[in-house]
């Protein structure tokens, strides 16, 4: 198991949930945290602890984005009109690596980020290697010609545990269009996400 894969499943164990809905997640077999003390009964969490866990889970789901990037997203969301928690989800779903993952161009969010950083993704026909780039409604996201034959891309397209959401329109197997910014209810999270608690965490 690679270091990144091991770290990914460690996050699952720490959260006690199958964050990405993967069949091989260790929490499908056990429901306690990593390490030798993982089976100890956990005490009641404080409000701060609950908020922190919600933040770690959401941040981890999107490939463990840096705290600097994540807080920047929160700050931008808080300045936008409307509900801050919904705005935050919209900004996270507009990340280029997130759209690549949702389009089933990659089997994991980490692989999606690699595809972007290695120059295999096009936005409106132009190569883009910035995973955090904000995609806009109407933008076309496509795979480069070499990427279309990659094993990980073919693996992702064959995955049955997740579907391409309605806010992303498919155009063949190598191109999608980002139709609209989704609401929280539209995002196909395998586990419950609570962005309202993330807002409370940063509003302390």
Curated annotation (Swiss-Prot):
Keyword annotations from UniProtKB, A to Z: Ribonucleoprotein, Ribosomal protein, RNA-binding, rRNA-binding
Originating organism: Rhizorhabdus wittichii (strain DSM 6014 / CCUG 31198 / JCM 15750 / NBRC 105917 / EY 4224 / RW1)
Region (Disordered): 13-46
Name of the molecule in the record: Small ribosomal subunit protein uS4
Molecular functions (GO terms): rRNA binding; structural constituent of ribosome
Entry annotated with the keyword Ribosomal protein: yes
Similarity field: Belongs to the universal ribosomal protein uS4 family.
Superkingdom, taxonomy of origin: Bacteria
CDD domains named in the record: S4 (cd00165)
Assembly: Part of the 30S ribosomal subunit. Contacts protein S5. The interaction surface between S4 and S5 is involved in control of translational fidelity.
Function: One of the primary rRNA binding proteins, it binds directly to 16S rRNA where it nucleates assembly of the body of the 30S subunit.
Keyword Ribonucleoprotein: yes
One annotated Gene Ontology cellular component of this protein: small ribosomal subunit
Domain S4 RNA-binding: 94-157
GO terms classed as biological process: ribosomal small subunit biogenesis; translation
One Pfam family of this chain: Ribosomal_S4
